[in-house]
UniProtKB/Swiss-Prot annotation:
The keyword Zinc-finger does not apply. The gene is proB. SUPFAM superfamilies: Carbamate kinase-like, PUA domain-like. Keywords: Amino-acid biosynthesis, ATP-binding, Cytoplasm, Kinase, Nucleotide-binding, Proline biosynthesis, Transferase. HAMAP family: ProB (MF_00456). This is Glutamate 5-kinase.
Amino acid sequence: MNNWKRIVVKVGTSSITDGRGSPSGEKILSLVKECVKLIRADKELVLVSSGAIASGREIIQKLSKRKDLPAKQALSAVGQVRLMQYYSQLFSIFKQPIAQILLTAEDLRDRKRYINISQTFETLLEEKIIPIVNENDTVAVEEIKIGDNDTLSAKVACAINADLLVILSDVEGLYSEDPNISSNALLITDVYEIDESIEKIAGPGKGTGGMFTKVQAAKIVTEAGIPMILARADVENILERIVLKKEKVGTFFYPSEKHLNKRKHWMLFMAKPEGRIYIDDGAKDALLKRGKSLLPVGIKKVEGEFTRGDTVSIFDLRGEEIARGITNYDSLELDKIKGKNTEEIRNILGEDFYEEVIHRNNLVLTNRGDL
């Protein structure tokens, strides 16, 4: 284990609320003490905290029974203020400054905003300020929702080049089976690769806080070369034991040996594909087996509307996504030159054109096992 300097810690709602679902001052104080301990040990810390909606229910009880989106967003708007009051009051006891950052998926999909957010985090961390992060539920309609704070914490960890992501939960780690159902369930202490067997253990269904989202979070960070630890939140001094004492706790997800550079990682996990390009088997082999750029001649079909510089998905003729990349052509241009060779393209577009639709430096394979 390395000497981790920059750590992202994610806590779920159950880790900071009481049995009635209301924010627990005792639990939050315990978390605050742990965070301060890390800062005083010269660590840099980002805290991704759920609990806004639960905090809102405490204040506006008549909305708490409604399940519609506007009610949830109203609860989040009220609850986020209440949650930050808890954190502000308790961190102030230790004279520890904090900041609030609310994000949507759109903030991370847009490359310029992504870089700007990274720089904001950088400045806060340099000043020993703890950013407290949550999804901006009040404005996050379905199209721009990140969806869960496990995923959010993983994307934040990648954006700031963290050394470690710690997800604190109500379970000790990843088990071989559901420990609530099977007495034969065993704690998996080490995960070296997130393959189909690990994803199967995590279960189906893309819930907003279950084991599936935690394993997907691990997949995001490990592909960026960042390890992740999944551990139980209510274990005494859990962060000190993990970060400072380097104790073996919970499940440790090891970083991928062939992890992606930051740009390609952003393309695969952050950017939203604006269209689809379908390619023939020859072009597929060139991408997967020979590491080549994508040329117009291998393209069979173009779907969607996109402009130069957008991220697009690349599919084979069987409908399987094989890669993503940044296109040199917009969808109208590409539709004109698909399947054409260089001379034919010159006759269509003139002398000013790109030989590659997507250069290999701007292309990343979606199935990392193909690398």
